[in-house]
Amino acid sequence: MRTTYMAKPNEVERKWYVVDAEGQTLGRLASEVASILRGKHKPTFTPHVDTGDHVIVLNASKIQLTGNKLQDKIYYRHTNHPGGLKQTKAQDMRANKPERMLELAIKGMLPKNTLGRKQGMKLHVYAGSEHNHHAQKPEAYELRG
């Protein structure tokens, strides 16, 4: 009888990928990056083991939103004080913290558990086209969509 392959944490080989977000749609880019972070693009994918790769996302400030989402979409956060609900429009978020906008979209597509938080730490988002991970020799990743 054959058994299903289960990757072991010490056997996993990690690569570094660079993704250019310029002109990409937020949700479509986020779903592909989340898939890479989880390791679903590998034949050795195992749901309970972190088999994913590191992803560097560049040009987060040039991400696109479809329709009227740039004016209508609202991001909420709470200060944990009474009456401390804060809201930010997507337009302001893209102008002030474009990295945060992309991080929220990608991390929202990862599992909500310890493994998902560990996978989310392999995400590196930059607003501009420069990054400081040249020592890891990242390779360009061509998006499917």
From Swiss-Prot:
Keyword annotations of the record: Ribonucleoprotein, Ribosomal protein
Top-level taxon: Bacteria
A GO BP annotation: translation
GO molecular function: mRNA binding; structural constituent of ribosome
Tagged with keyword Ribonucleoprotein: yes
GO cellular component terms attached to this protein's record: cytosolic large ribosomal subunit
Gene3D superfamilies named among the record's database cross-references: Ribosomal protein L13
UniProt entry tagged with the keyword rRNA processing: no
Pfam families in the cross-refs: Ribosomal_L13
Subunit structure: Part of the 50S ribosomal subunit.
Family, as annotated: Belongs to the universal ribosomal protein uL13 family.
Cited function: This protein is one of the early assembly proteins of the 50S ribosomal subunit, although it is not seen to bind rRNA by itself. It is important during the early stages of 50S assembly.
Protein name per the record: Large ribosomal subunit protein uL13
Gene source species: Shouchella clausii (strain KSM-K16) (Alkalihalobacillus clausii)
